[in-house]
């Protein structure tokens, strides 16, 4: 990226306005591929597929086809519905997606680089577990939380309007419009209503780029708008790209909302504070205030998506909860805020005072029953939690079987190391340990006792290794029993927790 930027400093002004010349840069394919590999983010795929058939010569030919085509003919090939659904086999459409996505990634990344450095109060973190210390510090001082599921079914013209603030090249905007409409028409109506923007079908890079751009647009206007109501002095226009247009749009939205409420109600929001955190499509807004203020915030969120993105925001996508009375799920944890009494002794001269101090504490709880259900689905145990052999792994070597069970336990232990119900995790370990022994016994057509005699202590030491747990136990000698250790190396949700979260989201939607 830096090399490409140094080579184009002389023409930076017109390159920011016009993207069409970038389609004909022969070195952009390699630069865009390296740029994609270097990007960090929890939602990025671990394996990058880059077509060996891709070349910018194909993009040039596709552009010529667009110029010469008849309006009644489909843009990227046969309009037959059966062939259109399988658009990933269409060579022209796939090449156009790859080329256009690379151009957008490089161009927008170059323009937004100095804006990202100037963002005040924004923290982009690599590890999921960095969220939980923040929540432990902020949520106990809040009494309400709004759980928001960001809507992802959006019209292509709204996406074009989003990119219009970044792209001034009219031909590129027309090309983007054609691609987005073809992308929309490539899905059946049922899939379009559920997930048209972040679907895993087709070009993953393109859908990921659309999702990140859409979320950035939402947060660019939503967070300052909320700050305007809760703390009018905290809104900084300098942190926005294209600050003039952003300031104008925000003022218009604020003026519209101010007409709906009186000045007395605005006064109630002055002494409140608000915290915002997001992972993927889930956003949390923690608020200290009254129930009336929570209803106001919910009302403004509905109108924000309705008037700015022109889409219907389903009521189930915003769930407001009182932290002291209920718990909520986030990133595979059950979270609640409970009161913790403390006995404080203060000595003043000859007098000794004993008083009770009550503080709030965030309690992250590992969903043991949901993990057991996931293990049963993966055939590690039955529905009652009794360990069974993993028959599909009996063709592997003993070392591979031990290593796979070891990785499953290590990932679970590290992900839920900060939970308060550690005893339930060791119950999960017991199930995995017996399932491993039964799998080896089934492979060698023997019993668990014979396997233990043959492997000896190797089954219980090398597999499910203790050294990672020893790190946690060594810290526990020098810290309070209530403090927790969060692993800063975890960058994505545990697969078992992700499966449980998907099941819960389906229940909420139904």
From Swiss-Prot:
Its main location: plastid. The keyword Plastid applies. InterPro entries: Domain_X (IPR024937), Maturase_MatK (IPR002866), Maturase_MatK_N (IPR024942). Belongs to the intron maturase 2 family. MatK subfamily. HAMAP family: MatK (MF_01390). Usually encoded in the trnK tRNA gene intron. Probably assists in splicing its own and other chloroplast group II introns. This is Maturase K. It comes from Thuja plicata (Western red-cedar).
């Amino acid at each position: 990226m830096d090399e490409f930027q140094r080579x184009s400093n002389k023409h930076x002004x017109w390159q920011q306005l016009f993207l069409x010349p970038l389609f004909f840069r022969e070195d952009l394919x390699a630069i865009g591929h390296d740029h994609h590999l270097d990007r960090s983010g929890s939602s990025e795929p671990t394996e990058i597929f880059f077509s060996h058939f891709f070349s910018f010569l194909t993009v040039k030919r596709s552009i010529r086809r667009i110029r010469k085509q008849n309006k009644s003919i489909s843009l990227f090939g046969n309009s037959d519905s059966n062939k259109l659904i399988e658009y990933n086999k269409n060579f022209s459409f796939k090449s156009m997606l790859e080329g256009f996505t690379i151009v957008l990634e490089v161009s927008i990344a170059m323009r937004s680089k100095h804006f990202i450095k100037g963002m005040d109060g924004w923290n982009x973190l690599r590890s999921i577990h960095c969220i939980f210390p923040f929540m432990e510090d902020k949520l106990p001082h809040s009494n309400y939380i709004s759980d928001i599921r960001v809507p992802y079914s959006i019209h292509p013209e709204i996406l074009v309007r989003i990119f219009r603030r970044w792209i001034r090249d009219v031909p590129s905007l027309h090309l983007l419009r054609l691609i987005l409409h073809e992308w929309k028409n490539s899905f059946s109506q049922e899939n379009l209503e559920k997930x048209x923007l972040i679907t895993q079908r087709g070009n993953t890079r393109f859908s990921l780029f659309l999702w990140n751009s859409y979320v950035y647009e939402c947060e660019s206007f939503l967070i300052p708008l909320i700050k305007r109501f809760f703390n009018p002095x905290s809104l900084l226009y300098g942190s926005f790209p294209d600050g003039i247009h952003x300031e104008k749009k925000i003022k218009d939205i604020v003026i519209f909302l101010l007409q709906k409420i009186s000045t007395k109600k605005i006064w109630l929001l002055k002494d409140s504070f608000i915290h915002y955190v997001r992972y993927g499509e889930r956003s949390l807004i923690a608020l200290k205030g009254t129930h009336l203020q929570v209803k106001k915030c919910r009302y403004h969120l509905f109108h924000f998506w309705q008037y700015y993105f022109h889409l219907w925001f389903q009521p189930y996508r915003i769930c407001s909860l009182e932290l002291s009375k209920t718990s909520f799920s986030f990133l595979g944890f059950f979270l609640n805020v409970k009161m913790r009494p403390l006995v404080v002794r203060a000595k003043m001269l000859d007098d000794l005072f004993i008083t009770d101090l009550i503080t709030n504490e965030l309690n992250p709880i590992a969903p043991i029953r949901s993990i057991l259900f996931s293990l049963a689905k993966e055939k590690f145990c039955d529905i009652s939690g009794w360990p069974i052999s993993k028959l599909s792994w009996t063709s592997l070597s003993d070392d591979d079987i031990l290593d796979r069970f070891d990785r499953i336990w290590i990932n679970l232990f590290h992900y839920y190391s900060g939970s308060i119900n550690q005893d339930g995790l060791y119950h999960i370990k017991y199930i995995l340990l017996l399932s491993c022994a039964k799998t080896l016994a089934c492979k060698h057509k023997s019993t668990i006792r014979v396997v233990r005699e043959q492997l000896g202590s190797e089954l219980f030491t090398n597999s499910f290794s203790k050294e990672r747990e020893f790190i946690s136990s060594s810290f526990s000698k020098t810290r309070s029993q209530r403090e927790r250790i969060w692993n800063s190396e975890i960058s994505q949700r545990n697969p078992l927790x992700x499966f449980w979260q998907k099941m819960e989201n389906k229940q909420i939607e139904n």
